[in-house]
Regions:
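PLP-dependent aminotransferase-like
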Residues: 72-113
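Conserved PLP-binding active-site segment in aminotransferase class I/II-type PLP enzymes
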Residues: 1-73, 77-78, 99
Length: 113
C-alpha cells in the first residue's frame, strides 16, 4: 500500500508569488541591523494603521502572538470558553489555551464554509 504524503502547508509556493518584493525588503531590514522595533517596524505600523483606518497598530512576530494579544484585549482568560472551528491551524487552539481559556470546537456548515 502506497501512503500519500500531503504537506501541512506549502510556504515555498506562496513565497514564489511574492519573492521579488520579499527579498528586496528583507535585505533592507538586514542592512539596517534592526530586526526588532526600529524604523522599518515603525514605518510598517504607521502605514498599516493608515491603510486600515485606525489610530494605532502593533506588529507582532507571528499569528499566534496576534491571536493571544487579541484574546487578551477582549478580556478572555481563565474560565472562559472560546468557540472555534477545528478546521484551522493548530495555533488557534494553542492561543486560546495560552490565555487560560478552553477551546470549544464546532463544525462548519458545508454550504456556508
Amino acid at each position: 500500500m502506497k501512503i500519500l504524503q500531503i504537506p501541512l502547508i506549502n510556504l515555498k509556493k506562496q513565497y514564489e508569488t511574492i519573492k521579488e518584493d520579499v527579498d528586496k525588503n528583507v535585505l533592507r531590514v538586514f542592512s539596517s541591523a534592526q530586526y526588532i522595533m526600529g524604523e522599518n517596524v515603525k514605518q510598517f505600523e504607521k502605514e498599516f494603521g493608515e491603510y486600515i483606518g485606525v489610530k494605532h497598530s502593533i506588529s507582532v512576530g507571528n499569528g499566534t502572538d496576534a491571536l493571544i494579544i487579541a484574546l487578551k484585549a477582549l478580556g478572555i482568560g481563565e474560565g472562559d470558553e472560546v468557540i472555534t472551528t477545528p478546521f484551522t491551524f493548530f495555533s488557534t487552539a494553542e492561543s486560546i489555551s495560552a490565555v487560560g481559556a478552553v477551546p470549544v470546537f464546532v463544525d462548519v456548515r458545508r454550504d456556508t464554509f
